[in-house]
């Protein structure tokens, strides 16, 4: 008699995705982040659900309801900080996952990659609308500044901004709709993640060498299930350490002041995971130009498969490309740092240079390095 997991219509899908899935025998820990992102998503949905049970999306009570969750609800402070720091862990895993894809040429699976870029944009949108919900100073002014960027769109910009706000400023209507978006988006992310996985399983996983994986495959379970559990435990350990020892490490103190439309914080800045894009936005002294650079800094990922010039898929055996890749990582860290600094002398020019270098590396230097490496190998 055949095992039920291979015959039952539902079990068969799960079996083919997580148990009998043929997986390359040599994938490293960089391949752990996919499952960790799934874990993050589940954690965020669960903690978010419990927070939504006690939260009120209304300008007069939103801030108080978050304070009520932290003070009066059993383990409310824990759920709230798990959710806030869980978002940071989510982005750490996301950026590691994307970095892995860039380094090992996983972007050559174009459908999987494009759904991945769409997922990144959706997660960023979710995090942005979620940050507005506690209705602190940074929530309010962050929402005002970022939504206002749409007014840079010629002709329809101002109308579009007022349509999103539901009025002439960020107010009650804005908060209510942002809560609605924040509730629905994670389920859209879940659906997109399923499609992401569907496309991945059409081709099978890439591996560090970049050569076809079908040479040597092993079943996903038990080899990679145990490896994923180790990764999950490390993720949970890090998240718990962050949540229980320094819950406010990554937050902004301004968000502990209730939103006040009459007083602007000294430095308006987003959460750390958006700082690199914020630095690129600020480095261009023109509203429309800045908005376009901001969009392009993320959407550039879509064009990466087209910029592949090397005949080798992975960077594993390409020292020149490796050097440029790590320069890109250093550049992104520099941009993240600059995004959190005030707009004054040394920071402005450093931000502008780092922004130029970011686009130069991806659009010019890395494709050129690929061609040089082909020549060096007499290809």
Curated annotation (Swiss-Prot):
Heme b b562 binds at residues 83, 182. Keywords: Electron transport, Heme, Iron, Membrane, Metal-binding, Mitochondrion, Mitochondrion inner membrane, Respiratory chain, Transmembrane, Transmembrane helix, Transport, Ubiquinone. GO terms for molecular function: metal ion binding; ubiquinol-cytochrome-c reductase activity. The chain crosses the membrane at residues 33-53, 77-98, 113-133, 178-198, 226-246, 288-308, 320-340, 347-367. Component of the ubiquinol-cytochrome c reductase complex (complex III or cytochrome b-c1 complex) that is part of the mitochondrial respiratory chain. The b-c1 complex mediates electron transfer from ubiquinol to cytochrome c. Contributes to the generation of a proton gradient across the mitochondrial membrane that is then used for ATP synthesis. A ubiquinone binds at residue 201. GO terms for biological process: mitochondrial electron transport, ubiquinol to cytochrome c. Binds 2 heme b groups non-covalently. This is Cytochrome b. GO terms for cellular component: mitochondrial inner membrane; respiratory chain complex III. Changing residue 296 to F: In strain: Isolate South Africa. Belongs to the cytochrome b family.
């Amino acid at each position: 008699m055949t095992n039920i997991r291979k015959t039952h219509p539902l079990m068969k899908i799960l079996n083919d995705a997580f148990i009998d899935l043929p997986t390359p025998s040599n994938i490293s820990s960089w391949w752990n982040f996919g499952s960790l992102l799934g874990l993050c998503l589940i954690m965020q949905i669960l903690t978010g659900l419990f927070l939504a049970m006690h939260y009120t999306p209304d300008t007069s009570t939103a801030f108080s309801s978050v304070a009520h969750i932290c003070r009066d609800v059993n383990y409310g402070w824990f759920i709230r900080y798990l959710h806030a720091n869980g978002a940071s862990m989510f982005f750490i895993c996301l950026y590691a996952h994307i970095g892995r894809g860039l380094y090992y040429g996983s972007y050559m699976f174009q459908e999987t990659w494009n759904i991945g870029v769409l997922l990144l944009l959706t997660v960023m949108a979710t995090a942005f609308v979620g940050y507005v919900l506690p209705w602190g100073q940074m929530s309010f002014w962050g929402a005002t500044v970022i939504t206002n960027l749409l007014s840079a769109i010629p002709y329809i910009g101002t109308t579009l901004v007022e349509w999103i706000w539901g009025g002439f400023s960020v107010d009650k209507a804005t908060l209510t709709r942002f809560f609605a978006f924040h509730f629905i988006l994670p389920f859209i992310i879940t659906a997109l993640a399923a499609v992401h996985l569907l496309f991945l399983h059409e081709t099978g996983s890439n591996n560090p060498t970049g050569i076809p994986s079908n040479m040597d495959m092993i079943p996903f379970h038990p080899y990679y299930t145990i490896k994923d559990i180790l990764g999950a435990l490390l993720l949970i350990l890090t998240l718990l350490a962050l949540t229980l020892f320094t819950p406010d490490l990554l937050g902004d103190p301004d968000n502990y002041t209730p939103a006040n439309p009459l007083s602007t914080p000294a430095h308006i800045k987003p959460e750390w995971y958006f700082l690199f894009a914020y630095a690129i936005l600020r480095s261009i002294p023109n509203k429309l130009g800045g908005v376009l650079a901001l969009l392009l800094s993320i959407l550039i990922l879509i064009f990466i498969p087209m910029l592949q010039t090397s005949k080798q898929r992975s960077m594993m055996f390409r020292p020149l490309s490796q050097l440029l890749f790590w320069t890109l990582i250093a550049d992104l860290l520099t941009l993240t740092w600059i995004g959190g600094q005030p707009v004054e002398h040394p920071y402005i020019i450093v931000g502008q240079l780092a922004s130029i270098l970011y686009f130069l590396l991806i659009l010019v230097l890395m494709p050129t390095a690929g061609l040089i490496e082909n020549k060096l190998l007499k290809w």
